[in-house]
Amino acid sequence: MEHPMRKIRIEKVTLNIGVGESGEKLDKAYELLKRLTGQKPVKTKAKVRVEQWHIRPGLPIGVKVTLRGEKAYKILKEKLLPAVDFKIKASSFTDRGFGFGIPEYIMIPGMKYDPELGLIGLEAYVTLERPGYRVERRRIKRSKVGSRHRLNKEEIIKWAQEELGVQII
């Protein structure tokens, strides 16, 4: 039996669509994430100037939504992982979690093609943690998580296979 403080859990699931420009495409991406999650997405802004693409700092170029708690687990298990057939590359795993891309939103179960939206893909990133990680985020008496308590790539891969039924390719 595993110690309760060593139990791995989902901190958050972040869904991101990088459009690369503001305007109609950005509004479509915003609407897609709103329909998929039932939450209000936030627009992400450019940090650097890219002259060739007509991007300047502060210009909205993408949308993202962060899911936490039971809702994050439910959407990951019922919608996002079935869209990629529960298969994720080993190189997609890090010490903090794992990420994967969904080429077109119509691959997600329950999502129908909408001619107004067109075909849009999105990225999902799952951030994992153990109980006790709050010591790094709190404001008072902030501290570091010890190296033995910190997650590593092998533990995350094992957890994803057992808990979520993910196949590593």
Swiss-Prot record:
InterPro entries in alphabetical order: Ribosomal_uL5, Ribosomal_uL5_arc, Ribosomal_uL5_C, Ribosomal_uL5_dom_sf, Ribosomal_uL5_N
Keyword terms, alphabetized: Ribonucleoprotein, Ribosomal protein, RNA-binding, rRNA-binding, tRNA-binding
GO molecular function terms noted in the UniProt entry: rRNA binding; structural constituent of ribosome; tRNA binding
Family matches, as Gene3D superfamilies: 3.30.1440.10
Stretches of the chain forming a coiled coil according to its record: none
Keyword RNA-binding: yes
Alphabetized Pfam families for the sequence: Ribosomal_L5, Ribosomal_L5_C
Annotated S-S bridges: none
GO biological process: translation
A GO cellular component annotation in the UniProt record: ribonucleoprotein complex
Biological function: This is one of the proteins that bind and probably mediate the attachment of the 5S RNA into the large ribosomal subunit, where it forms part of the central protuberance. In the 70S ribosome it contacts protein S13 of the 30S subunit (bridge B1b), connecting the 2 subunits; this bridge is implicated in subunit movement. May contact the P site tRNA; the 5S rRNA and some of its associated proteins might help stabilize positioning of ribosome-bound tRNAs.
Family: Belongs to the universal ribosomal protein uL5 family.
Self-association state and partner proteins as the record states: Part of the 50S ribosomal subunit; contacts the 5S rRNA and probably tRNA. Forms a bridge to the 30S subunit in the 70S ribosome.
Identification of the protein by name: Large ribosomal subunit protein uL5
Organism: Nanoarchaeum equitans (strain Kin4-M)
